[in-house]
Amino acid sequence: MSAIADITAREILDSRGNPTVEVDVILDSGAMGRAAVPSGASTGAHEAVELRDGEPARFGGKGVQRAVEAVEGEIFDAIGGMDASEQVAIDETMIDLDGTPNKARLGANAILGVSLAVAKAAADEIGLPLYRYLGGVYARTLPVPMMNIINGGKHADNPIDIQEFMIQPVGAASIAEAVRMGSEVFQALKKILHDAGHNTNVGDEGGFAPGLKSAEEALGFMTRAVEAAGYRAGEDIAFALDCAATEFYKDGRYHLEGEGKVLDAGGMTDYIAALAKSFPIISVEDPLSEDDWEGWAHFTSTLGGAMQVVGDDLFVTNPTRLRRGIAAKSANSILIKVNQIGTLSETLEAVELAQRAGMTAVISHRSGETEDATIADIAVATNAGQIKTGSLARSDRVAKYNQLIRIEAELDIAGRFAGRTILRG
């Protein structure tokens, strides 16, 4: 395997028009890997820390020139000449160099950009697609998408408290068919919303952001769209929610301001249970606050037999927090976001840890994305079975679906679509 010969970084824009880091790693053979780093809007308090410049006169303080300098300076000095195939050693070298528990000194955005680009360069060196390089001969499962078609919360400017309302085409036979089904429902929903007098502007992740007043109303529109597209809700297409409950958790209570409700953890459990009785909800993410461990355990013991309970802000792709959650039976699934932990090797460790504990893993985008489709390869490499990467609009979201379609075509008969195997209960 070739050694790392050069690393260059640059400041580019993400899908929200904010700066982010892009990194090129060049090996002495000429092989190259390029990676662009995503960024979140609703971020957990325990996530790895992005390094921003903090200069108000430039990008409103959000510039990433300091992270770029860290990549081309300290990080290159530390890992230049290392074997690109030694992913764990390279990642650990960067972690040690940073010296903080949350990668705050050099920036998780700097470290992650290098980590992903190193893996891509190593794959390029031996002529393998990234999913095959990372996952080996067993990388073959095409994930069921979670497609965000209605946005609320921090992802939209409307009264809906819940952040994401998603569809999962569990009845599809392939990823290509799943994408088609999702697109047809998305277009049907657009017409139904328009005919009902709602705007059809889209939010950060490509879903519609209509001025609806409640989760029940949003789920009702989704059901109508599924049926209008010629499918059966609950049979062909199931629903998933991302509550992002930390965003409306204050003083020990959950404030659903759009619906005029103030609930405790038990009340939130009952609230979701009631929605699940009326609609085919098979997965709910972050139904409680990121540090409400007791509430999470109660929620999962109550509803986890029938639905997937996904920890995002709870776990922040961190193996240490995940181990605590496994011991406490806080959730039965983890959302995997590469920039929450900041290196590829730690990301893969979290997936493996969850799977060994009998949990599912959902590979996820962030609200601030780029055309980089690395997470599609990671989803297949880990046989995760599920991917969350936004709506059927905006090229930064569609790029991941298109990459999955390419991978499916390349795998041919060796590939399998996860489909109904993700269902619980």
Curated annotation (Swiss-Prot):
Biological process according to GO: glycolytic process
Protein EC: 4.2.1.11
Main localization category: cytoplasm
Root EC class: lyase
Keyword Electron transport: no
UniProt catalytic activity: (2R)-2-phosphoglycerate = phosphoenolpyruvate + H2O
Disulfide bonds: none
Its job: Catalyzes the reversible conversion of 2-phosphoglycerate (2-PG) into phosphoenolpyruvate (PEP). It is essential for the degradation of carbohydrates via glycolysis.
Name the record gives this protein: Enolase
